[in-house]
Amino acid sequence: MALEDMDKKYRISDIARELQVSPQEVLRFVKQEGARVASTSSMVDTEMHGLILGQFSDEKKMVDETRKIRAEKKQRLNRLEEQSRKTVEKEDQLRDTLQPSPVPGRVEVPVPAPIEAPVAAPVVPDAPVAPVEVVPPAPPEAPLMAEAAVEAEPEVAPPSLEAEEDSPVEAQANDQIVSYDAPKNIGGLTVLGTLDMESESDRKRRGKKKNFKESADALKDEFDTTGSVELDDDGKPKKKPGSSPLGSDLGMGKKKGKKKKKPEVDEKVISANIRSTISGMDVGAGSGSRSKFRKQRKMEREHEQEEADAFREMQQQVVRVTEYASPHELAELMSVTAKDIIQKCFTLGKFVTINQRLDKESIELIALEFGYEAEFVSEVEATEVVAEVDNEEDMDTRPPVVTIMGHVDHGKTSLLDYMRNSNVAGGESGGITQHVAAYEVTGSNGRKITFLDTPGHEAFTAMRARGAQVTDIVILVVAADDSVMPQTIEAINHAKAAGVPIVVAINKIDKPEANPEKIKTQLSEAGVLVEEWGGENQCQEISAKKGTGIVELMEKVLTEAEVRELKGNYSKEVLASGVIVESELDKGKGVISTVLVQRGFLKVGDPFVAGNTMGKVRAIMDERGKRIQSAGPSRPVSVLGFEDLPQSGDVLTVMASDREARDLAQKRQVIRREHEFRRSTRVKLDSISRQIKEGLMKELSVIIKADTDGSIQALADGLMKIQNDEVKVQIIHQGVGQITETDVLLAAASDAIIIGFRVRPNVNAKRLAEKEDLDVRFYSVIYHVLEDVEKALEGMLSPELHEESLGSLEIRQVFKVPKVGNVGGCYVLDGKILRDAKVRLLRDGVQIYDGTLDTLRRFKDDVKEVDAGYECGVGLKNYDDIKVGDVVEAYRIVETKRKL
């Protein structure tokens, strides 16, 4: 058992989560201790685990203390809620206890204004008298309110609050001196305390209120039928001489005092007494249940700890692995030896070596055998670099990244063109933006804005989606003389999915047919409600050609940025990171990528990794081609120094050294190569077997060469959309750069066509293509590519067949011709009968033959056609069973070209 504990492995990220500290801090400590670890996903042994716990013991104590404080706070809130609930219940109990039903024969002690002499009242034996209302005090002492207790909610004061409540109660008590005299000769009406005249309901109620019975009895002994009830300085009742004591409930007294006017009651004082009394009761109850609360708090802590342990254990049972991992890599992730993995494969009937790549099904099966669940991730996710936590002092306001979206030709590039004061659209083919371009614009107040100009047509759906992932604000451009198009709604959906606020720019308001209100109505139907109509989206009417409203639009964008409080890490010590917006292959400079820096400063000479490639920054240029030495957050720059072409959307991360960058890139390349090799082999075999089974699938093989990676992705997405189940586009190769001999040879071997988008073939490739008679097409606008490929696919579709009726004839006589068979003498009822038409023979409306004509004669001559109203002779091919009255229908099958 001890050996198993020594061999146990711990993941650094799990230890950091347990200690509530940054994984990078734990990683740095482990490296300082001399352990060889690559990332926070690496495993450490039990000894290192103990060192980590010792190093971060203060943090662990702080975490435990924080959890303890939170639990106690939660208990305190629950206890206050319970006390509040009990307070309401006890107030109801006091009302029921101290307000009994009136009983005949009771004597009422009215509380008049202060008087000096006692007031005598004649005895009226038979009249029912209101009872004397007694306020039972809670121990140790409480103020008495005689008549006031009937009007308000009676209560007793706690000992802790006695001093605070004495003064108002005494003032009230001094004004409420009540006295009455009884005749001296009451003739044996002395109450011995054994007769109770209460009603049955009152007796039951008094039996339930045991807590107040003793205090009530104590007060009764202090009253006398002939005395007066007074309150002394301490708020206790004074005794006065009398001939007869008061009974248990004063029920034996047959006297009726003179009824006096009731004094006004101070509701505020009584309410304060009630609250203070209940508070005192609750304090006593709470202190008595302190041990119970401790036990409950301990149980809840144990329950929370059990839940946390269960969640941590569940997380540890999930292993994140790439597809086609080796037994050695799988063993490291599951904290077992490679020997155990290989032995388990043998038992499953798989013979593998330590470095052999396993397929997805095998990895899932092996993980289940060891009690793990396999979660497959991409090669980039498996080797992602965990960024350090940003320090608050390094954060500062950064320029907003704004994406301009909208439909084709609604004026997106013209808007950016006006703001940059340069002719951007002039450099694009057909005035249509073909790339995602990033530009930095300085406003009138000196504040900068970074713009991403995405193409508007639907071929660039993926490019527009990538733009929305890195953007902070979206400017949605809609032409006032047009309407909200499907691509506009698509852009709205992309922005909403990314959680990005939208600022609406209604363009072309200078045109006479402009109708901004119609655009606002259509936008509201699409889920974008402008501020003028009570929505959250800012709106500005502009004219990109004349510059109307451009300044106001930029101010609204900056206002939106201020609301979002956009900040970036401007520390020069932190390792920079950014996103690849676009990449292309230049003949003289090599790979050039447009990078949007998101964190830190990207400097010349920094080693980096981006996707599956790595490199070292050789040069940094702004959007106008001017060389700079560094670039901060939200600044778009062109970077030189990539070893290979990265993909748009890849994350560029600066590494500490060239070796780290190269190792990480090579690891990703190995996983990617293995994945593509396995996938391509499987897809080819599957496609072959599927085509053998179906025999109907037709493919148009295509090789795409373009000037940028973004254009390739847009072309591929557009081509995949126009296929169906019968014909499809098979992209066998795609790449950036000019068309080479290798591309031509691949096209010749695969019977493919080559599409060059804004690129040309070299001399040798051109000669080889002419020799092989290959179809090489060149385009500069994506629309034309999609149209031509769609036409090609439509030509590969099987034509749609439908029947066209030509005419019908009736057999009126049957002739038997030697060596020929039966021939019908017919009359053409309608239409026209053609010699080469298909016919069907109908008898009583039922088809009994379907074929072709053998002979068609008029008189003795063979003819090609016979019109309606004429007679003719007809013979059916290989069929003689014709009778008088049969009908022959002539028809032909017409083929119609199908469209996708």
Swiss-Prot record:
Q: Where in the cell is it found?
A: Cytoplasm
Query: Which taxonomic lineage is given here?
Result: Bacteria, Pseudomonadati, Chlorobiota, Chlorobiia, Chlorobiales
Q: Name one Pfam family in it.
A: EF-G_D2
Q: Where are the stretches annotated G4?
A: 507-510
Organism encoding this protein: Chlorobium phaeovibrioides (strain DSM 265 / 1930)
Chain intervals with Basic residues compositional bias: 253-262
Domain tr-type G positions: 397-567
Describe its function: One of the essential components for the initiation of protein synthesis. Protects formylmethionyl-tRNA from spontaneous hydrolysis and promotes its binding to the 30S ribosomal subunits. Also involved in the hydrolysis of GTP during the formation of the 70S ribosomal complex.
**Gene Ontology MF term list:** GTP binding; GTPase activity; translation initiation factor activity
This protein is called: Translation initiation factor IF-2
Q: State the signal peptide span.
A: none
Q: Which gene encodes it?
A: infB
Instruction: Name the segments for region: G5.
Output: 543-545
